[in-house]
């Protein structure tokens, strides 16, 4: 006899309700709503208890969805299986029963976790489990959930049960939304780069611009090594650590950061990389290349040459007024005509690299794959044998995210900082992320139940756009998207928020003054 699959649906009754309305303090919930909406459930889910709750909720919903899909049109009668009235072969029935039993066992395992996730506990509390849980599993719920997420991601579940995601419909709405998302992503990347430039200048770090090319005879080695770029930047970080007389296995996050953007040449479509190195201390052996020379026309750092094993690199010191090189006594270089190098602001190199971020989106790079067809015709055969790779913008962890402390700001001020527009500060997206992180820490003592009760109703933006297009028309769709996310200006925010922007030195007016600082030197 096949198992009673219908009985599965009774298990759902053990799932803890998300709406214990009888116990809610509705005034408290209403007071929480603005902060939770501004912070966002995805950010709050980084807290252990809420994160595991959401993880199990999503896992259960997917497994139930797959089970419901598999059971469509399936009936059992005296041991025989019928699919939409047609009797299935015995081997088909046996396989169906075996797979479905495994699916139900996986669901039962997830349901067993749920009672251990006390939604009346705070969202920052790491769940452990009761005595019975320990006897059965010999590990905490935290350890179990982390292992489950690592070893059994939702993608693997879809693949095993042959239940792929439905492909979205490509229409004008989806294209506009995709373009808007990519534009926002590129804008955020550029903000991080420019903020890192600003911070490096303020902290007196050395900034080096580098171009990394790929030699013909090193292409295969580069494509065969998935960690080629990671290893290169790690080696540079270790050189900085060595210069500071620290251990090679120390973290170099506090003394070295990098930003790297790939580009395919417009002439031949050849892949190369533009990198910016930020170093608190120059690697050992770094000396002024113009020292003792009558013509000061050299800018490359000898200490960083020959560190890129896959081709040619050209590490150049970024020079501007009061830069770290000038403070270390380096001479100001001249151009090919012997004239002092043209004065530019310390942000100029940021704008230079930013143009490549704007030039190439992730989708552009994905479409290119190995590079344009014109990339050195003599290498076509070799390239065709290499695996296609997607090269994305790479940067250090938390690169360009540093901001003036927000610990003393009110919750109202933090909410406003998540809604600032670009006109208020060119670093509005970085401020938003920092404010959300601070809010998550403060909301850590709120219970899971309260967060679930206060979370806003989510709207499927794409469906909403498709429904609205009949009223507004395709021509007005772009402006309609912009109007849906209204941003605050300086005139809309409190004095506390304005004071924070002034103290951090990131108002548009303040940065406009700083951008006029020009290069100089000896």
UniProtKB/Swiss-Prot annotation:
Keywords: DNA replication, DNA-binding, Endonuclease, Hydrolase, Metal-binding, Nuclease, Viral DNA replication, Zinc, Zinc-finger
Record flagged with keyword Nuclease: yes
Example of a GO biological process term: DNA replication
Gene designation per UniProt: A
Zn finger region (unnamed): 255-277
GO molecular function: DNA binding; endonuclease activity; zinc ion binding
Active site positions, chain numbering: 352, 356
Function noted in UniProt: The A protein is a specific endonuclease that cleaves the viral strand of supertwisted, closed circular DNA at a unique site in the A gene. The A protein also causes relaxation of supertwisted DNA and forms a complex with viral DNA that has a discontinuity in gene A of the viral strand.
Protein name in UniProt: A' protein
InterPro entries the UniProt entry points to: Replication_gene_A-like
């Amino acid at each position: 006899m096949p198992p009673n699959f219908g009985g599965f649906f009774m298990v759902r009754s053990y799932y803890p309700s998300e709406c214990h309305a009888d116990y809610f303090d509705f005034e408290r919930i209403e007071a929480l709503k603005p902060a939770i909406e501004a912070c966002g459930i995805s950010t709050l889910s980084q807290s252990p208890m809420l994160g595991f709750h959401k993880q199990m909720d999503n896992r259960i919903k997917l497994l139930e969805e797959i089970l419901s899909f598999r059971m469509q049109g399936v009936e059992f009668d005296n041991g025989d299986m019928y699919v939409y009235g047609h009797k299935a072969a015995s081997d088909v029935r046996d396989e169906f029963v075996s797979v479905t039993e495994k699916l139900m066992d996986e669901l039962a395992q997830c349901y067993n976790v749920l009672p251990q996730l006390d939604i009346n506990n705070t969202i920052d509390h790491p769940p452990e489990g009761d005595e019975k849980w320990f006897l059965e599993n010999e590990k905490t719920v935290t350890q179990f959930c982390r292992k489950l997420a690592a070893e059994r991601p939702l993608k693997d579940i879809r693949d095993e049960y042959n239940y792929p995601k439905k492909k979205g419909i490509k229409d004008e709405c989806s294209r506009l939304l995709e373009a808007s998302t990519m534009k926002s992503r590129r804008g955020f990347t550029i903000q991080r780069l420019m903020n890192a430039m600003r911070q490096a200048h303020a902290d007196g770090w050395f900034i080096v611009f580098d171009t990394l090319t790929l030699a013909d005879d090193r292409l295969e080695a580069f494509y065969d090594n998935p960690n080629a770029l990671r290893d290169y930047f790690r080696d540079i970080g270790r050189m900085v650590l060595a210069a500071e007389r620290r251990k090679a296995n120390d973290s170099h996050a506090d003394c070295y950061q990098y930003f790297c953007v790939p580009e395919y040449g417009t002439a031949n479509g050849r892949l190369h990389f533009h990198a910016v190195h930020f170093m608190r201390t120059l690697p050992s052996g770094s000396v002024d290349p113009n020292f003792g020379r009558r013509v000061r026309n050299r800018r490359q750092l000898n200490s960083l040459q020959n560190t890129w094993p896959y081709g040619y690199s050209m590490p150049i010191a970024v020079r501007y007024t009061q830069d770290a090189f000038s403070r270390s006594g380096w001479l100001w270089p001249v151009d090919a005509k012997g004239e002092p190098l043209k004065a530019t602001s310390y942000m100029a190199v940021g704008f230079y690299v930013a143009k490549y971020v704007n030039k190439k989106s992730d989708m552009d790079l994905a479409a290119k794959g190995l590079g344009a067809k014109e990339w050195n015709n003599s290498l076509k055969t070799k390239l065709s044998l290499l695996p296609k790779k997607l090269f994305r913008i790479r940067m250090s962890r938390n690169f360009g995210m540093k901001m003036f402390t927000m610990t003393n700001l009110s919750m109202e001020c933090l909410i406003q900082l998540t809604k600032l527009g670009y006109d208020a500060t060119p670093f509005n997206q970085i401020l938003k992320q920092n404010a959300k992180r601070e809010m998550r820490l403060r909301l850590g003592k709120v219970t899971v139940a309260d967060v679930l009760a206060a979370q806003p109703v989510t709207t499927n933006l794409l469906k909403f756009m498709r429904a609205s297009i009949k009223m507004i028309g395709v021509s007005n769709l772009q402006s309609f998207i912009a109007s849906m996310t209204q941003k605050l200006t300086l005139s809309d925010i409190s004095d506390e928020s304005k004071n924070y922007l002034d103290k951090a030195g990131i108002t548009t007016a303040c940065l406009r003054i700083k951008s006029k600082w020009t290069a100089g030197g000896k």
